[in-house]
Amino acid sequence: MATMTDPPVEGFRLSQLIYDTRYRSMTIQVVAFILIMLGLVWLANNVVTNLQALGKDFDFGFLGNRAGYDINQRLVEYSNDSTHGRAAIVGILNTLLVAVLGCITATILGVFAGVLRLSKNWIVSRLMGVYVEGFRNIPLLLWILVIFAVMTEGTPQPRDFRGEDAEASMILGDSVAITNRGIYIPNLVFNRSLGGNEVDAETGAVVASQSAGDMILLLVVIIAGFVASGFIGRRATAIQEKTGVRPPGTFWMRLGAVIVPALIVLVALGATLEYPELRGFNFADGIHLRNSLIALWFALSLYTGAFIAEIVRAGIMAVSKGQTEAAFALGMRPSWTMNLVILPQALRVIIPPLISQFLNLTKNSSLAIAVGYMDVRSTLGGITINQTGRELEGMLLLGLFYLITSLIISGAMNIYNNSVKLQER
């Protein structure tokens, strides 16, 4: 029973959804969500209607059809009799290959360029400035074409390596050949495969048919070694923080955790190096890095490295000058100051924008078609769509690949960023 002191009961009115601040934001969000869903339903209905008008259906069965085209640069077995799904896998691996190589070299180049741009040496600083401004302000596609032209027109032909008075010669102890058809480097061959070897009936030679699986095993062992090395390093750091003394031999233990297991696997698999050799009109054996891969890799590295250099420079400048002065007051060398004091603190500023550069490099690799490098854009998003007419399914798969790859890169880098950021109480 209500009394004279009870507050009046306010009834709900529809106008409150707009004028009452307690409900307004929720109302706007619900309306926006409904409009977006209606738009997606309209688009889906429009696509279905158009497909029916063209006599098409939505199906991914084309991935099992014969591809009928060749891919020159590949990491796994492939022929023109393989399926479109196999071609897509080859393209995905080619994309990941150039993305990983590009991220590594761009980071190394960007760190060096960013540090050297802050050098007190006028010539070094200005040279790095020219590099950064030059590559940042010229389109990436142009650099890809320029490097590709230099590789094809400015390097010797394989026939120039022939004869006693050859015009060209191999480098690094006759193990690497740079030609207008690409770069030939030694190949790691396993003579004792864990999956069993095939023996040539005529020659009795061992064919390492399981080399792909053996290489995966080697990579897994190396990654596990790095994980163990990181655990040893963290354990040593914890002991040092507790006792003030770092355990002796930590560096060699970390190094051994990576090298020793890898060497054991290499010896167990009978690993040897297969060197490129000139036979007839071209080089045989070894690994052939084609000009398309080299041009794309170098261009992505140089272009993205210029942006990373500015990120590194900004991160270093964000660290208080007092840190440098304190390090010098303790008698530390400039190189030690940069490696042990400045860069570890600058990482907190560098990592977030660095994630965006890694994502940009991965997506910029789709320009590979300009020089004939068969990445996933060229295979699944190019030739496969042209042959099958499945443009909707192909583009959906292509977009899904780039989405998943970007999320993985972003997630991994965010985990690393959380490990280096300042821990507050």
Regions found by a protein language model. Name each.
Residues 2-425:
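Transmembrane alpha-helices and adjacent helix-loop boundaries
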